[in-house]
Structures are given as C-alpha cells and as structure tokens.
C-alpha cells in the first residue's frame, strides 16, 4: 500500500459483470466458489441494515464496526467491511492468530466499538469466559450473528453482558443475508431467525418443491 499509486482509472462495468469469487465453508463437501456480480454489494445493503438496526451516512458518523470474521469470508467482507464503507462508516482492523474472548472484550471496550458481527462460536466462547460479570465501558449499539441457532441462554446473556439484543440472521455464501431479526422494529424470539429482508421472497418447501403452508417436523427446505 505504501508504494501504490493514488491515481487510477475506474473500469466501466455492468451490474451483472463478475466482481469476485468467494468460497463456501464446504457444508456439503469441499468448498465451492460462488461467483458474485457487482450488484451483490447493493443487494446486501438491506440485509446488513436490518440486523444492525439501520445505518446512516449522515454526519457526524457515530457507528464503528469490528468483527473477528476474516475479510476473505463472506461474513467479514460482505456482512461488515464493504457495507460499512458504503455508508462511510469506519471499520476497525485487528489481526489475531486465533479468537480470544478476553482480547475481544478489551478491544470492544477500549475502542468503543458500536457495531459487530460475532459468529455463534465466538459468542459462546465469550459467554464461557465471562458468564455473568459486567464489562465496563461497552458502548455497543448492535450485534448481529448467524450460522447456527444461538439459544435462549445466549440471547439473554447478550442482553445482560453486552447490553444489547443479538439479532440473528440467515444466509449462505451464494445467497447471503436473506432473513433477519431487527430488535428496533420487531420482537426477537428464541429459535427465530426473523423475517425476510426487503427485496427477498422466502418460502418453506418440501423435497418436491411444493409450498408448505404450515411447516411441522417433516423435512423441509428454505426456498429463496
């Protein structure tokens, strides 16, 4: 970066032109590359605003993002870094060899982090490290999480220790941030990942692609 030129010519692209390839976590086998077009970033914006209870580019900017999620992953890049920059919101960068709950509490407190995406595994480690002790100087405004169900105990811990409700959301690398909670406009319930993010239609279907009007215990699929 020190030797990079500060002048460049922007290449003209279409919204449908390929922008980048992000690899999945390999849920059903090895990681697979998901080719995302340039329009993907703008398509992500509503899905970021909902769990973070709406963002603003108005001055003065009061929000401040940080996440332990790697920026090479869809969660770090498209759930935090690029959307925050879209709004002109600063993002804290911190390099660590592995997730450390003590360092995380210290960083969020000292730097006055306002917004964070914390994967469920990170939240569970933080709860194990500090199950009940009040943490001083936390100024969090929003916490988003997704990847697996958090459970009632973890959600209640978030309210008591982090000082905010944790907004759970759902998405995949190739179709991210499609369903979400938003404590600012709807009650959050244990076991619920919220409602469809504006711009998406979400349906529960069976193996034959038929709509299930009243999902029960039978095998069903999320269709977006």
Name what the model sees in each region.
Residues 18, 24-27, 65, 108, ...:
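Conserved S/T- and glycine-rich ATP-binding loop of Class I adenylate-forming
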Residues 203-222:
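Conserved beta-loop-beta connector loops within the AMP-binding
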Residues 42-114, 128-129:
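Conserved AMP-binding/adenylation subdomain of ANL enzymes
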Residues 86, 113-118, 127-188, 201:
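Gly/Ser/Thr-rich phosphate-binding loop
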Residues 1-4, 16, 39, 111, ...:
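Structural detector for helix-capping/boundary residues
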Residues 24, 222-224:
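Conserved small/polar residues in nucleotide/adenosyl-binding loops
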Residues 3-23, 30, 55-64:
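Conserved pre-ATP/AMP-binding loop-to-beta segment of ANL
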Residues 10-13, 191-197:
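Short Gly/Pro-enriched turn/cap motifs at secondary-structure boundaries
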